[in-house]
């Protein structure tokens, strides 16, 4: 079923094609039909649908009947567009986010309709053949969006600074990043009700951190009562982000629940970015990182203490670093990986990744291959599991490694933190930032050649590795 927008698109494409067949310029057709050239441009771009009398005038000038002009039937050249529009494929592509306006798309389709529609349909078919769910498609698009901006978003940073300024002006005190202050903002400014008991009544939701319930009089935030203070602060900061930036389209549950549009996925990211930027303010972090990079020796304990000083989770801390480094340090050749692992299990899964500015050697694999067991991000999970046998509350732990890729020759300096995935039982996660060890990195990070840091030959997966004497190999190549 074609909606109004698609009908406008079809009419505009048909009008443009008929005009070109008559070898008329837009200015000539507009004058002959008694309409302005700007109005004609709006019609051809699919933004406007003309009144009946205007259609009569256009049809007369172009030498076609009124019925032919308004018919949704297209000639052979343009017919693939109908299939494309009816498939809703364009709705699955977040084109506007990437600066591809409807007018540009219409122009592309009009110039090569069969090729463009076939290309877009192929993208959709590939995603279906690989059983890529719609939300996975949205997440892939989101990663591309982050890469375009080096994972730094000035407009959100400015929103955070403005929020803190308004807080200080209204209350006469600086925002102190405490759990109580975050709760009070939601309770008093945005009239929320925060319920920490409801989720515990449903065992199947014990791993869900929060749910948003929109009500006419008062929004309700259901918080998992098993969350620690650090996790609660992030969820509250995220809710403030939604409200302060007026992000209306949202997924009511956690990010892994199915999103019905790319805008929901994007807004979830924006709210999370806001929370990270609020809890880890930009200027103190830049100062801390400058001091860290000046040291000639790596100090893991000092790195953990830096993280703890912000009272945030390892993932929030490491992800925030990936936002600051490209913009303020010029270190934009990096990757971020999050692995999860069930205790007493040798299966390791990448659940989040980001590559700046392009894919690096360690990356997700959809073929169920076995990731290289020499990666620090996997070894640190093994180490944490061993520590948890002695102490269930062990962690977080931090480790570093220089990883030299056998085939590409690329070398990465990797910093990894592992912790228990509280409140999810019996699961651990590790987050890793890997820096391409180019001249720029070595000039800015003094401890890159600390002799105490291990250098290991690594590869991507066991199945693709040519090493024959690898003790860590879990399957044959």
What are these regions (language model features)?
Residues 9-10, 17, 27, 31, ...:
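Short juxta-domain linker segments that transition from a proline/glycine-rich
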Residues 24:
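Glycine-rich phosphate/oxyanion-binding loops and their immediately adjacent helices
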Residues 1-21:
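A short, Lys/Arg-rich alpha-helix, primarily the initiator
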């Amino acid at each position: 079923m074609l909606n109004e927008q698609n009908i406008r698109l079809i009419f505009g494409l048909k009008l443009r094609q008929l005009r070109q067949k008559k070898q008329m310029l837009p200015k000539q057709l507009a004058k002959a039909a008694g309409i302005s050239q700007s109005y004609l441009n709006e019609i051809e771009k699919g933004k406007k649908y003309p009144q009946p009398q205007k259609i009569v005038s256009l049809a007369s000038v172009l030498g076609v009947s009124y019925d032919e002009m308004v018919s949704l039937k297209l000639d052979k050249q343009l017919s693939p567009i109908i299939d494309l529009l009816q498939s809703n494929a364009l709705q699955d592509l977040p084109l506007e986010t990437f600066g591809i306006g409807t007018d540009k798309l219409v122009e592309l389709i009009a110039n090569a309709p069969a090729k463009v529609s076939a290309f877009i349909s192929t993208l959709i078919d590939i995603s279906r053949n690989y059983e890529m769910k719609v939300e996975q498609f949205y997440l892939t698009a989101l990663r591309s969006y982050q890469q375009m901006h080096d994972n730094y978003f000035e407009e959100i940073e400015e929103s955070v600074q403005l929020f803190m300024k308004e807080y200080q002006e209204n209350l006469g005190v600086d925002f102190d990043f405490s759990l109580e202050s975050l709760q009070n903002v939601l309770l008093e400014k945005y009239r929320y009700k925060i319920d920490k008991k409801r989720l515990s009544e449903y065992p199947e939701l014990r791993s869900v951190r929060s749910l948003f319930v929109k009500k006419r009089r008062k929004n309700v935030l259901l918080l998992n009562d098993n969350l620690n203070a650090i996790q609660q602060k992030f969820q509250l900061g995220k809710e403030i982000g939604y409200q302060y930036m007026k992000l209306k389209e949202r997924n009511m549950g956690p990010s892994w629940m199915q999103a019905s549009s790319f805008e929901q996925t994007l807004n979830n990211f924006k709210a999370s970015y806001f929370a990270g930027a609020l809890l880890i303010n930009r200027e103190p972090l830049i100062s801390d990182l400058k001091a860290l990079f000046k040291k000639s020796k790596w100090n893991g304990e000092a790195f953990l203490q830096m993280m703890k000083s912000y009272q945030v989770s390892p993932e929030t801390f490491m992800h925030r670093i990936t936002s600051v480094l490209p913009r303020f340090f010029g270190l934009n050749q990096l990757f971020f990986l999050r692995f999860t692992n069930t205790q007493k299990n040798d299966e390791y899964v990448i659940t989040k990744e980001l590559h700046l500015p392009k894919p690096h050697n360690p990356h997700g694999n959809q073929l169920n291959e076995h990731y290289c067991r020499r990666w620090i991000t996997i070894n640190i999970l093994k180490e944490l599991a061993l520590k948890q046998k002695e102490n269930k509350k062990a962690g977080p732990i931090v480790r570093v490694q220089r990883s030299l890729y056998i085939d590409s020759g690329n070398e990465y300096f990797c910093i990894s933190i592992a912790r228990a995935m509280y409140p999810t039982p019996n699961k651990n996660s590790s987050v890793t930032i890997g820096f391409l060890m180019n001249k720029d990195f070595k000039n800015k990070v003094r401890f890159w050649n600390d002799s105490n840091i291990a250098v290991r030959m690594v590869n991507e997966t066991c199945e693709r590795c040519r090493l024959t004497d690898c003790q860590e190999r879990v399957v044959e190549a």
